[in-house]
Amino acid sequence: MPKLKTKSGAKKRFKITGTGKVMYAQAGKRHGMIKRTNKQIRNLRGTTTLFEGDAANVKKYFLPNQR
C-alpha cells in the first residue's frame, strides 16, 4: 500500500519541531489592525505551539508521514 499524501494546505500552515510539537502562525494580522493596540499587534508576531489535542489531529490526518 502506498504512502498517504500530505495535505498541501497543511504543509504550508504547520511545522513539526524536533520534539514533535506542531507550530503555526497566529491569525489576525492581515488587515483591520488600526482597531488594535500596539500590544495586541506585537503579541501576534511569530509562531505558537498548537494545543496537544489539535496537534494530534493535524499529525494524524493532514501530515501523516511527518510523525
Curated annotation (Swiss-Prot):
<dbReference type="InterPro" id="IPR001706">
    <property type="entry name" value="Ribosomal_bL35"/>
</dbReference>
<dbReference type="Pfam" id="PF01632">
    <property type="entry name" value="Ribosomal_L35p"/>
</dbReference>
<comment type="similarity">
    <text>Belongs to the bacterial ribosomal protein bL35 family.</text>
</comment>
<dbReference type="GO" id="GO:0006412">
    <property type="term" value="P:translation"/>
</dbReference>
<dbReference type="InterPro" id="IPR018265">
    <property type="entry name" value="Ribosomal_bL35_CS"/>
</dbReference>
<dbReference type="GO" id="GO:0022625">
    <property type="term" value="C:cytosolic large ribosomal subunit"/>
</dbReference>
<dbReference type="InterPro" id="IPR021137">
    <property type="entry name" value="Ribosomal_bL35-like"/>
</dbReference>
<dbReference type="GO" id="GO:0003735">
    <property type="term" value="F:structural constituent of ribosome"/>
</dbReference>
<keyword id="KW-0689">Ribosomal protein</keyword>
<dbReference type="InterPro" id="IPR037229">
    <property type="entry name" value="Ribosomal_bL35_sf"/>
</dbReference>
<keyword id="KW-0687">Ribonucleoprotein</keyword>
<protein>
    <recommendedName>
        <fullName>Large ribosomal subunit protein bL35</fullName>
    </recommendedName>
</protein>
